[in-house]
């Protein structure tokens, strides 16, 4: 069999970004050695707040072109709270990437692992395993500052727009049901919940209408709906009852962080932003400049994002060995928590970034 070479545009970024992305790359390299004919070329690209301070640009010249030509994009963390543009907003080229590469499907897995902090006392909390599927190119983020689309924006009034289109929403809901089908094959619930505010906003009513039109195309998947305020309650009361939850941009932004809190913290929050032709993968947490350079960051969100990237590449490039490598990584993390061998500082543990990385490398079989 000819070796498969995958090209990944790699943005280490700011703060803890370079540290956690190097941890993930080490783990992916080790897993790749364990499977046949899988090679990954990591094309490093400068971007972010630190780069902006030096150059006045948020991405190096040709950086976006390199990203567009890569098989996938892997990002550490971008932005520093002390570095802002003249309009007061942070440096966030990754928000621009969402639109440029049409990354409409934001996949945010939430899974409970043994020996991690459980915020809920109910014994069912150990069963938490759901995905927040967040639309990433429109919704209320349509007028995010990076896009400069506000029609009214002055010192007395600012008007933002929640934009929902049939084209994007149809693709998103189809993505949700297909994701639920894949998860059902792995023993998950096989259920999609549309989370919206259809009783108040016309845009949200359209979001739900399209969901109801599509659900009959997937008779093997259970479909239901829930208002977003009720879902905030349900995620605290019974999050184990959910599988795939599909929602507008700002709702997903908020509820995915709530989900991260349920299973320990944002150090476990992986993220994939996927379109029809491109995929960007990154931890959902920020750059955490307060622990930058202290070897305290939890690299697991980035490692899990890297595993998700491998699954994406397996489908995109018809590369089953990438799926094998992803499974190796996931099994190593599962085993590590089951044996209490992974104890991040974030959870009150005693293991540094490098120690967690080394432990996972040892667990890869």
Each language-model region and where it sits:
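Buried hydrophobic positions in well-ordered alpha/beta secondary-structure cores of metabolic enzymes
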Residues: 14-17, 71, 133, 176, ...
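N-terminal glycine-rich phosphate/adenylate-binding segment common to multiple enzyme folds
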Residues: 52-159, 250
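Flexible, glycine/charged-enriched surface loops at secondary-structure junctions
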Residues: 36-42, 184-195, 218-226, 316-328, ...
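N-terminal beta-loop-helix "entrance" segment that forms/cooperates
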Residues: 37-61, 235
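Extreme N-terminal starter segment of soluble prokaryotic enzymes
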Residues: 3-8
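Short acidic loop-to-helix transition motifs that present clustered carboxylates
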Residues: 115, 226-233
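Glycine-rich phosphate/diphosphate-binding loop of Rossmann-like nucleotide-binding domains
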Residues: 9-26, 30-35, 152-228
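Glycine-rich phosphate/nucleotide-binding loop
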Residues: 49-51, 107, 234-340
């Amino acid at each position: 069999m000819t070796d498969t070479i995958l090209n990944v545009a790699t943005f280490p970024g700011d703060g803890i970004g370079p540290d956690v992305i190097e941890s993930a790359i080490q783990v992916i390299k080790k897993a790749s050695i364990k499977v046949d004919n899988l090679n990954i070329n990591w094309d490093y690209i400068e971007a972010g707040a630190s780069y902006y301070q030096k150059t006045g640009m948020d991405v190096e010249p040709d950086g976006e072109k390199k990203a567009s030509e890569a098989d996938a994009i892997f990002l550490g963390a971008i932005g520093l709270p002390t570095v802002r543009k003249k309009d007061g907003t942070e440096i966030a080229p990754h928000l621009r990437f969402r639109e440029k590469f049409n990354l409409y499907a934001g996949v945010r897995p939430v899974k409970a692992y043994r020996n991690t902090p459980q915020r809920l006392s109910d014994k069912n909390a150990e069963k938490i395993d759901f995905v927040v599927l967040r639309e990433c190119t429109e919704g209320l983020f349509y007028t995010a500052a990076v896009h400069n689309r506000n029609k009214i924006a002055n010192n007395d009034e600012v008007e933002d727009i929640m934009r929902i289109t049939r084209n994007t929403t149809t693709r998103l809901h189809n993505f949700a049901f297909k994701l639920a089908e894949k998860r059902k094959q792995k023993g998950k619930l096989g259920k999609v919940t549309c989370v919206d505010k259809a009783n108040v906003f016309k845009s949200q009513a359209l979001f739900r209408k399209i969901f109801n039109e599509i659900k009959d195309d997937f008779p093997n998947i259970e479909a239901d709906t829930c208002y977003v305020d009720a879902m905030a309650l349900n995620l605290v009361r019974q999050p184990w009852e959910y599988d795939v939850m599909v929602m507008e941009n700002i709702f997903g932004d908020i509820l995915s962080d709530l989900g991260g809190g349920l299973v320990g913290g944002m150090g476990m929050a992986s993220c994939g932003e996927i379109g029809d032709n491109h995929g960007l993968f990154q931890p959902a947490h920020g750059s955490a400049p307060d622990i930058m350079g202290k070897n305290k960051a939890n690299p697991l969100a980035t490692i899990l994002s890297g595993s998700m990237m491998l699954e994406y590449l397996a489908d995109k490039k018809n590369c089953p060995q990438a799926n094998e490598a992803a499974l190796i990584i996931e099994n190593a993390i599962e085993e590590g928590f089951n044996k209490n061998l992974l104890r991040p500082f974030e959870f009150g543990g005693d293991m540094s970034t490098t120690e967690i990385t080394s432990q996972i490398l040892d667990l890869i079989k």
